[in-house]
């Protein structure tokens, strides 16, 4: 079966990690043609250009895999074959009002076009239920997968990391990726008077007095492992939350907003849900006094291995090819 996988994102996000893993697994049995119409250094004003590029996608495949954007343009492009939608999350409530209005219209178009898809893939029970409740059928839940062995660390490696970035002497609280929508501003305001190392990571998209580290993946994992608490206080409905899952695999307690599919992950691993920033300081104190919460998280997170992910995707391909 020949597969065409339409991509829009250029930057690496949690969903790109998931997508690349699925592609690598399917490519072991099927030809996978990746078609990327994304724009480097994408800005919201360029979205019409992305949609225009999507409309020009053409070709015949046995199966096309599409995200939200490619479902929008599905009736207008020049493709032939069956279609699978992979939807991580849908929430534009954090956007400026004008964008919310525009995306509200596009969402209605999306839901109408989605009925033409042969299958829908989601990554959490929250989003599976979301589509089923709207009357969609053939909705599949295929969870994230992680290489658990890559989350092994020795004490010397951790100590070196702390010394390198001067993160010793007091507990580390990881606030999250340095984006406003990740809740780092509100989290910092709640915790800034505590005797803690407050750390963000990734490109600094908001100015905070907290330390910001732009790290490669291994050092990012060392940050999660070194932290006493990891926060995932996203302000939008997540598909899952890769950072929370990675922190749990590091055995580090997690406090999250629980929005969208994140709640299933946090509650499954008996982590702490904080749905109001006013209570965050109290929750951090609780996590600092109960580090054993991290081991409960690990026990749950370690169940999401590669074998189940591989079997789920290959089973779906078999169903669609029959």
Which residues are covered by each model-predicted region?
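Conserved donor-binding/catalytic core segment of Leloir-type glycosyltransferases
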Residues: 166-182, 188-193
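Carbohydrate-associated surface elements
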Residues: 126, 145
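Conserved acidic donor-binding segment of nucleotide-sugar-dependent glycosyltransferases
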Residues: 268-278, 285-291
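Acidic donor-binding loop of glycosyltransferase active sites
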Residues: 225-239, 252
């Amino acid at each position: 079966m020949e597969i065409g996988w339409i991509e829009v994102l250029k930057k690496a996000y949690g969903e790109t990690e998931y997508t690349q893993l699925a592609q690598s697994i399917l490519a072991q049995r099927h030809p996978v043609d990746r078609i990327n119409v994304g724009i480097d250094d994408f800005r919201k004003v360029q979205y019409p250009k992305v949609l225009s590029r999507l409309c020009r996608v053409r070709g015949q495949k046995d199966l096309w895999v599409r995200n939200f954007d490619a479902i929008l343009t599905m009736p207008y492009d020049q493709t032939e074959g069956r279609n699978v939608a992979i939807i991580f999350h849908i929430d534009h409530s954090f956007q400026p009002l004008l964008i919310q209005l525009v995306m509200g219209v596009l969402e209605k178009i999306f839901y109408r076009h989605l009925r033409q898809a042969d299958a829908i893939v989601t990554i959490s029970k929250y989003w599976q239920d979301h589509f089923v409740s709207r009357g969609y059928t053939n909705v599949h839940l295929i969870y994230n997968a992680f290489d658990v062995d890559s989350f092994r660390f020795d004490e010397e490696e951790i100590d070196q990391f702390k010394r390198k970035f001067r993160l010793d002497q007091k507990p580390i609280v990881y606030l999250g990726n340095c984006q406003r929508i990740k809740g780092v501003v509100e989290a910092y305001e709640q915790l800034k008077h505590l005797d803690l190392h407050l750390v963000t990571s990734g490109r600094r998209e908001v100015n905070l007095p907290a330390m910001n580290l732009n790290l490669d993946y291994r050092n990012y994992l060392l940050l999660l492992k070194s932290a006493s608490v990891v926060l995932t206080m996203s302000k939008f409905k997540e598909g899952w939350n890769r950072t929370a899952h990675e922190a749990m695999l590091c055995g580090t307690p997690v406090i999250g907003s629980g929005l969208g599919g994140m709640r299933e992950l946090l509650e499954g691993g008996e982590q702490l849900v904080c749905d109001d920033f006013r209570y965050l300081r109290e929750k951090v104190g609780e996590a600092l006094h109960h580090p054993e919460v991290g081991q409960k998280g690990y026990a749950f997170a370690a169940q999401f291995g590669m074998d189940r992910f591989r079997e789920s995707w290959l089973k779906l391909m078999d169903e669609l090819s029959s």
